């Protein structure tokens, strides 16, 4: 019997398919998630979930890791489409402390494992790393998890060294509520954790609530006159235009001195991928400004 050897094109196609990230169920489990930090983590490990929520918005807000089109969009995070979730036939559902109220319905579909990264007064980085290790162990990707965590620490260390000329000036990471108010990310936010790893001080020392405190008036920025302002999207429509013509805004010391950094979108409730994205975007913005502003 004559056996036909594969052509070069067929061989390349086979190799290309083999190089694609494996779905999570390739190691025995079809996994779904209702939480973005878990989604980031699964994608970073190359373990594709069968379903996850708000994928269009995830691609705009979290941006990375990229979500393949094969992942089913479950709709809103707080009120996922349970019919679509059921049709996705998950064997395991990952959730978080944000979605405890949904668990009675989720457990009717598949077993639920819950993570808690964000809690008042508790820095989230180590819980995020622990979550990555737990997911990696569950899905047979412990090596990938350890490699990713090591790469993150190495990236922070490298950026910290590059940012040494900026280390004497603090950073205040904020998100605009409107043209008169902002939310600030404190020490118990992921952004606050990253600042420490980059050797940068958080200019905001008051208490916050694990992501960002309730909106405060822009006049509070005058309390941190020496800081860099790291502006994190989303920005309300028209807010920047209003601020550009605001005498008060332009009199804020940091703004007047040109120390306003407008960053690209980042998930404020993210896991390690969001932490790395924030570190990279902030470092790029600071380095682009140069030490003259430092």
Model-found features: residue ranges?
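Extracytoplasmic/secreted envelope proteins and their assembly/folding machinery
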Residues: 35, 39, 43, 82, ...
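A short, structured surface patch at a secondary-structure boundary
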Residues: 30, 36-84, 88
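Extracytoplasmic substrate-binding proteins
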Residues: 30, 111-177, 204, 268, ...
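A glycine-rich, coil/turn loop motif that links secondary-structure elements
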Residues: 5, 27-28, 211-215
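Structured C-terminal subdomain patch of bacterial secreted/periplasmic proteins
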Residues: 29-30, 34, 228-294
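Binding-cleft/active-site segments that stabilize strongly anionic ligands or cofactors
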Residues: 63-119, 162-262
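N-terminal export signals
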Residues: 2-5, 10-26
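Short, solvent-exposed loop/turn elements at domain surfaces
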Residues: 39-44, 58-61, 179-183, 239, ...
């Amino acid at each position: 019997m004559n056996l036909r050897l594969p052509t070069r094109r067929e061989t390349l196609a086979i190799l290309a398919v083999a190089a694609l990230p494996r779905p999570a169920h390739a190691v025995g489990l079809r996994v779904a998630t209702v939480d973005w930090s878990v989604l980031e983590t699964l994608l970073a490990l190359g373990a594709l979930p069968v379903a996850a929520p708000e994928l269009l918005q995830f691609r705009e807000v979290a941006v990375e890791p990229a979500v393949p089109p094969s992942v089913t969009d479950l709709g809103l995070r707080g009120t996922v489409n349970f019919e679509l979730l059921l049709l996705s036939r998950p064997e395991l559902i990952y959730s978080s402390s944000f979605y405890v109220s949904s668990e009675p319905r989720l457990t009717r579909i598949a077993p639920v494992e819950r993570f808690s990264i964000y809690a008042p007064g508790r820095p989230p980085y180590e819980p995020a790393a622990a979550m990555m290790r737990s997911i990696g162990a569950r899905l047979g990707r412990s090596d990938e998890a350890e490699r990713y965590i090591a790469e993150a620490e190495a990236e922070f260390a490298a950026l910290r060294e590059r940012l040494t000329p900026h280390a004497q000036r603090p950073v205040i990471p904020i998100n605009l509520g409107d043209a008169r108010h902002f939310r600030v990310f404190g020490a118990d936010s992921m952004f606050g954790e990253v600042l420490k790893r980059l050797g940068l001080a958080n200019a905001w020392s008051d208490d916050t609530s694990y992501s960002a405190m309730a909106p405060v008036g822009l006049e509070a920025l005058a309390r941190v006159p020496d800081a860099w302002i790291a502006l994190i999207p989303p920005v309300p429509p028209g807010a920047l235009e209003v601020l550009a013509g605001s005498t008060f805004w332009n009199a804020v010391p940091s703004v007047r001195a040109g120390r306003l950094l407008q960053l690209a979108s980042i998930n404020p409730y993210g896991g390690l991928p969001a932490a790395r994205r924030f570190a990279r975007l902030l470092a790029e913005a600071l380095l682009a400004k140069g030490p003259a502003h430092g």
